Amino acid sequence: MKVMKFGGTSVGTPQRMKEVTKLVTKSGEPVFVVLSAMSGTTNSLVEISDYLYKKNPDGANEVINRLEQKYAKHVDELYSKEETKSATREFLRGEFDFLRSFTKELFTSFEEKSIVAQGEIISTNMVVNYMKEQGINAVLLNALDFMRTDKNAEPDPMYIREKLKPILAENEGAQVYLTQGFICRNAYGEVDNLQRGGSDYTASLIGEAISAEEIQIWTDIDGMHNNDPRVVDKTDPVHQLHFEEAAELAYFGAKILHPTCIQPAKYAGIPVRLLNTMDPDAEGTTISNKTEYGKIKAIAAKDNITAIKIKSSRMLLATGFLRKVFEIFESYQTSIDMICTSEVGVSMSIDNSAHLGEIVDELKKYGTVTVDTNMCIVCVVGDLDWSNIGFETLALDALKDIPVRMVSYGGSNYNISFLIREEDKKRALQNLSNTIFYKK
């Protein structure tokens, strides 16, 4: 069985819902479908929550009424049978009455998660009703019955697997199994959500749990590209990526995929395909354990980086010095992206400057501290094992006219990173594309 995940834009209108239905039933084989809320709905639900936090029930009710009117129009556009329209209207009436009930109660973060969850609950019910109207044997599985996080707010794969198995057995023979893509319960049974990776993560976890043949992530983009099309003048789709290459690109700025979401698929050895609902026949990108030896796949960039350098000839070589430095960053929950050391100094980069002042003050105990802001990490991704000669020279040649603050290689065989000024980002990405992909 394949798992197919569709984001908010893919189910953003009644017409898109109809087209998604055609896509998932095209093969005639059973599929497990994961849906997000209709585009714009989650923002409205967050707006409702904001009003309630501010003790403004009138503002919340205004947004609820506006959202209800929007969905009333969707019902008329989506369904052809009066019976289905009536049943869906009744369902929506209950959902919006539920939202209004929060305007009369004490409001906390727990209630906010329940409110935000309604977006996916509404979209999945609307789509499953449409499928049934079309004569499709579709079953709606409530994600709150099997998706759970543990006490560390991390997904609980064993629980998901154990809960899903009997649920699927009870509904054996269905053509489409449909569920929500963001919501879950926490270890205490409360409504919660998968904060990192959202519905992509859910699709990957479900794929692992049911030993899926393939996990498909459908968006409005033709998979991964070899550079950022918003910055450079030419890009091409990347048709094949190793799991590690995809993780590097996701971490360093490729917005199409969250770095955590492919981990379950990687561990289970299940291919992930990135496909485009607007162009379903496009090849897209396949992510798997396959390596294309010695090939550079793509370039990505990460903005809003801060570089920190500690210079201390007295302390650097002292036992435990680096441990003390790392403990400072850990105490402020600030991750280090890049690190380089020498006999008299250590340079690091971070992407979270929320506690920069406190971190710098503590680092000054150990030496002279220099901070550079408005930096950018540019990374070249591919099969870059040290035995593959020449990729370093190629990248450095492309950056020969651009000041490079740091270079990082060796922590991964799939990435070489350069820290540059943000103002040089466009030129760096363009030069790397010209040199590596288009031989200009």
Question: Across the structure, where does each feature detected by a protein language model lie?
Answer:
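Nucleotide/pyrophosphate-binding catalytic subdomain
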Residues: 1-257, 262, 421
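Structured core elements
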Residues: 3, 10, 32-33, 177-179, ...
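Flexible loop/turn segments at secondary-structure boundaries
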Residues: 11, 41-42, 148, 185-187, ...
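Glycine-rich beta-alpha junction loops
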Residues: 37-39, 221-223, 276-281, 291, ...
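A conserved active-site cap/scaffold subdomain adjacent to cofactor or substrate pockets
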Residues: 242-288, 292-314
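A conserved regulatory-domain signal marking ACT and ACT-like small-molecule sensing domains
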Residues: 283-440
